[in-house]
UniProtKB/Swiss-Prot annotation:
Matching Pfam families: GcpE (PF04551)
Binding positions ([4Fe-4S] cluster): C263, C266, C298, E305
Cofactors named for this entry: [4Fe-4S] cluster
Lineage: Bacteria, Pseudomonadati, Campylobacterota, Epsilonproteobacteria, Campylobacterales
SUPFAM superfamilies xref list: Dihydropteroate synthetase-like, Nitrite and sulphite reductase 4Fe-4S domain-like
Enzyme class: oxidoreductase
The protein, known as: 4-hydroxy-3-methylbut-2-en-1-yl diphosphate synthase (flavodoxin)
Catalytic activity, EC: 1.17.7.3
Keywords linked to the UniProt accession: 4Fe-4S, Iron, Iron-sulfur, Isoprene biosynthesis, Metal-binding, Oxidoreductase
A biological process from GO: isopentenyl diphosphate biosynthetic process, methylerythritol 4-phosphate pathway
Gene source species: Sulfurimonas denitrificans (strain ATCC 33889 / DSM 1251)
NCBIfam families the record matches: ispG_gcpE, PRK00366.1
Entry function: Converts 2C-methyl-D-erythritol 2,4-cyclodiphosphate (ME-2,4cPP) into 1-hydroxy-2-methyl-2-(E)-butenyl 4-diphosphate.
Keyword Oxidoreductase included in the entry's annotation: yes
GO molecular function: 4 iron, 4 sulfur cluster binding; 4-hydroxy-3-methylbut-2-en-1-yl diphosphate synthase activity (ferredoxin); 4-hydroxy-3-methylbut-2-enyl-diphosphate synthase activity (flavodoxin); iron ion binding
Amino acid sequence: MINRVKTKQIFVGNVAVGGDSPISVQSMTFSKTSDVFSTVEQIKRLHFAGCDIVRVAVPEMEDALALRAIKEQISLPLVADIHFNYRLALIAAEVVDCIRINPGNIGSRERVKEVVKACQERNIPIRIGVNAGSLEKEFLNKYGQTSEGMVASAEYNIKFLEDLGFDDIKISLKASDVQRTVDAYRMLRPKNNYPFHLGVTEAGTLFHATVKSSIGLGALLLDGIGDTMRVSITGELEEEINVARAILKDSGAAKDGLNIISCPTCGRIEADLVSAVGEIERRTTHIKAPLNVSVMGCVVNAIGEAAHADIAIAYGKGKGLVMVKGEVVANLDEHELVDRFVQEVEKMAKEF
């Protein structure tokens, strides 16, 4: 059981972040934000995939001016990602549910003061998003692109916002490699109680991003660290959500959806187990009940796994068993097994 660190709770739109709230999953569109149609379409795809909070890039004035039209067409909380030009943050703050600023490139303290004032007036939070690749010069010169440098930047900017009377804050500390990222979050966690946004930046394409994020975010989640998260995958909207949800579930940080146990296959199996598992995954994505299910290709491990599973299939030659709580409920031909299995899953899910 994960002993999650209790943090201050803030709200991004209607989504609670921190405190006792579930760890939320975020993503980011890759369309030009000024292209309202494409951006809204991507946000709706993310919403359907299970995203909780969505972020959009705001590099130009035309992007900032498009935010209102986007916000009117979506129901997910909207975060504006601001670099370099604080004036874009002032415009965005009139519309969005959260502002993300990068203290390494947003400009002078006077500019940050104006952003804070705009967020205070609308009662929206600020994410202090520290990146190893864009640290302020003073921290870069002293620490280099290190975990220590990221933590020093975060602490400095947290204090600056606090001195302005602003504490509606969440924090991220991202590097492109796992070790620096994990070390930074671990170093900063004991020093404040603000919610943490987890992520490994520039993680890469699907395979590499999944590996990096699973190691980095999984390690932090097992430490009880993290209140919201994004898995960054180059050009893969829905997969960001799928991987993030899987990391949350398999780390034990979230208790929703099926935990599917399936054998790795070997010479003993006499059924198309790969296709069966794939079909089960597709047909049960809507299930939120925290059920443990087992799909095994032969009797060697099937009975033992079934004893610990809510629902199980044990394949044999042309036939197989469906079991519920370790008891056989059906002995069927192979082509009937998945249908009956899904029926049992849906039946049990309704009881939760």
